[in-house]
């Protein structure tokens, strides 16, 4: 799997993400980006390629993961302000205990959020239903910080 990031630099997140995808795809395959379609559940995918991708953007950055396996990626600016009351709606009881004990609860909530979004993108289901039914850890190795953002990447 390869991951790339860039600043938006006047582009929309969509434009920057697609440019990253095209650059990664060309670097890996030597080919132009194949046609992209959206599944009935809303997940973008290539029409005729064995490669998979996931794109995320924040107000300042775009990120793209390209893999031979199904992949889901999400990112949030690490300094983003987030309503801590959201924890009651999206965290499982196990996650809530970790959140309550965290030194930096905003960062903890953003970490759980990107994990849940990355998992939703991986499955292609989105966050429909009950995000508080999943259990993640603040120590999850699929979370990293890159370019001032908290990033979660999951791969099947």
Task: Please describe what each predicted stretch is.
Residues 1-156:
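Core catalytic alpha/beta fold that binds nucleotide/phospho-ligands
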């Amino acid at each position: 799997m390869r991951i790339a990031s860039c600043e938006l630099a006047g582009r929309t997140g969509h434009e920057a993400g697609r440019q990253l995808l095209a650059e990664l795809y060309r670097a890996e395959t030597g080919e132009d980006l194949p046609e992209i379609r959206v599944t009935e559940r809303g997940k973008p995918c290539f029409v005729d390629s064995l490669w998979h991708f996931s794109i995320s953007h924040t107000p300042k950055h775009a990120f793209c993961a390209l893999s031979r396996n199904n992949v889901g990626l999400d990112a949030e600016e690490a300094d983003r302000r987030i309503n801590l009351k959201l924890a009651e709606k999206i965290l499982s009881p196990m996650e809530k205990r970790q959140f309550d004990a965290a030194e930096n609860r905003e960062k903890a909530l953003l970490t759980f959020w990107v994990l849940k979004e990355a998992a939703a993108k991986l499955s292609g289901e989105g966050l429909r239903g009950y995000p508080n039914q999943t259990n993640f850890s603040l120590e999850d190795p699929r979370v990293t910080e890159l370019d001032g953002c908290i990033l979660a990447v999951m791969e099947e």
